[in-house]
Amino acid sequence: MLVGKISGYEDNTRSLERETSEITSLLSQFPGNTNVLVVDTNFTTLLNMKQIMKQYAYQVSIETDAEKALAFLTSCKHEINIVIWDFHMPGIDGLQALKSITSKLDLPVVIMSDDNQTESVMKATFYGACDYVVKPVKEEVMANIWQHIVRKRLIFKPDVAPPKPRMTWSEVFQPVQSHLVPTDGLDRDHFDSITINGGNGIQNMEKKQGKKPRKPRMTWTEELHQKFLEAIEIIGGIEKANPKVLVECLQEMRIEGITRSNVASHLQKHRINLEENQIPQQTQGNGWATAYGTLAPSLQGSDNVNTTIPSYLMNGPATLNQIQQNQYQNGFLTMNNNQIITNPPPPLPYLDHHHQQQHQSSPQFNYLMNNEELLQASGLSATDLELTYPSLPYDPQEYLINGYNYN
């Protein structure tokens, strides 16, 4: 296993050395041994380009006639390495020269022109031009014109390739940004192609042009809300309203584009709004007792009030009238037209066990005393009670216990 690894390492080393030596030999040939043919009708332009390229050790030949230039290439095809031809050359223009040279001589051709129209650049590239430059040609462009020759030769020598750039450990283990790389699932629907080059850190993503359109948002206008209320009345009120029936009713009113979810959401908001508006109105109109009457039923009416006296407080049968309904206003016992008891009623007498047995065993009190006899026995009169408790809303005589001595 170790021998195989060493052998593979040696093969890679020899391949790298061979590629490096061949590239070094190519670099030694340029630009000093480069023969260039420049074809243009403007003789001044030719002289200027020739003078500049000679500074970079190019061997330059110039020609103002297209046919003579093409004949010169045919006669000395092994001496010219690259051709620069004017796009608007009379007789044989740049496109015709491209067709002839690339098919017969297979030389790199650079097209130069006074304009840089997209159509001209596209045609020149389509017919095989290796570059398209605008006149006057810049000096740095002419200085590096030899690169097209090297590129052409590398195409015919696929085994010769430039050495791979050495990568540092930080570049090798540099994580790819997660937000640029789509994962399996839904993210793949948003990307057409992915290009990731770890050597130079290039990361390119092309997004899809077509995206799913967003659904239009439903807006409840005043007119549409009125139609909504009419539909609720038609189906029998808010208690019977449901989204499915409301949608059908609104569609019958020729309202288009409304969905069940729209109606359900609006119906929920409408019910909440009704509840919020109903509670303050009840509180303001009827008071707290009416608004929350259901929470305290013991305060409503005489049916829920215990108006009888326990049997162990009475020596004999006693009949008491129930408190009238009109004595309770808003669930409170009104005293002196206020809801606060200012003068408490007389306390009920306390009877211990001895007195209770005495009164129960005494036969002389086993009859019902009327009010006059009770007042005479106690020494009190109705006038005294009224003066003592002038604001009582009930008759004190009704609550006097028969047979009890109040003196």
Curated annotation (Swiss-Prot):
GO BP term, pick one: cytokinin-activated signaling pathway
Residues with 4-aspartylphosphate modification: D86
SMART domains: REC
Disulphide linkage map: none
Subcellular location field: Nucleus
Entry-linked PROSITE patterns: RESPONSE_REGULATORY
DNA-binding region: 217-271
Tissue: Detected in trichomes and siliques.
UniProt keywords, alphabetically: Activator, Cytokinin signaling pathway, DNA-binding, Nucleus, Phosphoprotein, Transcription, Transcription regulation, Two-component regulatory system
Post-translational modification as stated in the protein's UniProt record: Two-component system major event consists of a His-to-Asp phosphorelay between a sensor histidine kinase (HK) and a response regulator (RR). In plants, the His-to-Asp phosphorelay involves an additional intermediate named Histidine-containing phosphotransfer protein (HPt). This multistep phosphorelay consists of a His-Asp-His-Asp sequential transfer of a phosphate group between first a His and an Asp of the HK protein, followed by the transfer to a conserved His of the HPt protein and finally the transfer to an Asp in the receiver domain of the RR protein.
Positions of short motif Nuclear localization signal: 214-217
Signal peptide boundaries: none
Domain Response regulatory: start-end pairs: 35-150
Phosphoprotein listed as a keyword: yes
GO cellular component, one term: nucleus
Entry's Gene Ontology molecular function annotations: DNA binding; DNA-binding transcription factor activity; phosphorelay response regulator activity
Entry function: Putative transcriptional activator that binds specifically to the DNA sequence 5'-[AG]GATT-3'. Functions as a response regulator involved in His-to-Asp phosphorelay signal transduction system. Phosphorylation of the Asp residue in the receiver domain activates the ability of the protein to promote the transcription of target genes. Could directly activate some type-A response regulators in response to cytokinins.
NCBIfam families: myb_SHAQKYF
UniProt cross-references to PANTHER family, sorted A to Z: TWO-COMPONENT RESPONSE REGULATOR, TWO-COMPONENT RESPONSE REGULATOR ARR19-RELATED
Assembly: Binds the target DNA as a monomer.
Annotated family: Belongs to the ARR family. Type-B subfamily.
Protein name (Swiss-Prot/TrEMBL): Putative two-component response regulator ARR19
Organism: Arabidopsis thaliana (Mouse-ear cress)
Lineage: Eukaryota, Viridiplantae, Streptophyta, Embryophyta, Tracheophyta
